[in-house]
Design a protein with these regions (language model features):
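Transmembrane beta-barrel strands of outer-membrane/channel proteins
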Residues: 43-49, 77-83, 115-119, 135, ...
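Solvent-exposed loop/turn segments connecting transmembrane beta-strands
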Residues: 49-58, 86-92, 121-129, 146, ...
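Repeated loop/turn-to-beta-strand initiation elements of outer-membrane beta-barrel proteins
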Residues: 39, 71-77, 106-113, 145-147, ...
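Outer-membrane beta-barrel "beta-signal"
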Residues: 252-260
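Outer-membrane pore/translocation modules
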Residues: 79-80, 87-182, 186, 251
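Cleavable N-terminal export/targeting peptides
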Residues: 1-36
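Outer-membrane beta-barrel transmembrane domain signature
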Residues: 147-232
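Residue-level signature of outer-membrane beta-barrel architecture
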Residues: 49, 65-69, 103-105, 139-141, ...
Length: 260
């Protein structure tokens, strides 16, 4: 019986280390180039169910709806969820949704002004609710379409976060809500090495305006090998770093994923 529980725990720990990162940052970059003047819908999902020596259930999905209007207006609606349960106990329940608008004041150079509104929650990060609204300016520094692009975005957003009651070192902490104004510096790159290999990288950095030592960095990079129009092998890595987490036992998170 003890060996059974140890084996179950090891499987859970391995899965957590390689499962998707628990965060309420939404990466809207992956399908950006595929959205033209027509209506586009992108859906992907996965699920897993095991029963026996251990009970495990997981469902994960991502949905993006987007369209360009008159060439200069880009509208995207993104939704994602990740729910996981082990032996009857949920240990991950993340939901995020975002509406983002870009106005391209220079279509040829891909310079745009953007605004967004987002809401989400993260069980693993102890966030009951995270609400964001903000905007900024995004500029492309590389003109080549064939080799890829390197974009830089500057902006700001209002952040409202709610945390539940929790206990730490035998001390019980009451629910708390934080309201911040954060400054952002974001980097978006897509490098095309040849007809088969490309690298897509996104880096979001978020700095509390009244205390720059309080920052969050989200890094996501994917190396793709394109076999055909319908088949791609990828290696994905992402990380989330918080300099001053509001929950003291919340650590930085990383995720590595290989897929087809």
């Amino acid at each position: 019986m003890i060996r059974k529980h140890i084996l179950s725990l090891l499987i859970l720990l391995i899965y957590v280390n390689f499962s998707s990162i628990s965060q309420t940052v939404i990466n809207t970059e992956s399908n950006l180039n595929k959205i033209d003047s027509t209506f586009h819908l992108f859906i992907d999902g996965m699920g897993d169910y095991k029963k026996g020596n251990l009970d495990f259930f997981m469902i994960k999905s991502n949905l993006t709806v987007g369209s360009r209007v008159k060439g200069k207006n880009l509208l995207r609606l993104t939704f994602s969820n990740n729910y996981q349960k082990f032996n009857g106990n949920a240990f991950k329940n993340n939901i995020s949704g975002q509406l983002r608008y870009n106005y391209f004041y220079n279509v040829e150079k891909h310079h745009s002004i953007f605004s967004f509104i987002q809401i989400g929650k993260s069980m693993r990060s102890f966030i009951d609710r995270r609400f964001l609204v903000g905007g900024g300016i995004r500029k492309r520094t590389t003109p080549s379409k064939n080799a890829g692009y390197f974009d830089v975005a500057l902006g700001a957003f209002y952040e409202n976060e709610s945390y539940p009651t929790y206990k730490f070192q035998e001390v019980e902490f009451s629910p708390k809500t934080y309201n911040n104004l954060r400054l952002t510096l974001n980097i978006f790159t897509r490098l095309k090495f040849n007809t088969h290999w490309n690298l897509v990288t996104v880096m979001y950095s978020q700095w509390k305006s009244s205390r720059l030592k309080n920052y969050r960095i989200f890094f996501d990079t994917t190396l793709n090998y394109i076999i055909s129009k319908r088949a791609t092998i990828f290696l994905k890595f992402n990380a989330r770093v918080q300099s001053e987490p509001y929950i003291p036992f919340i650590s930085n998170e990383t995720d590595t994923l290989i897929g087809f």
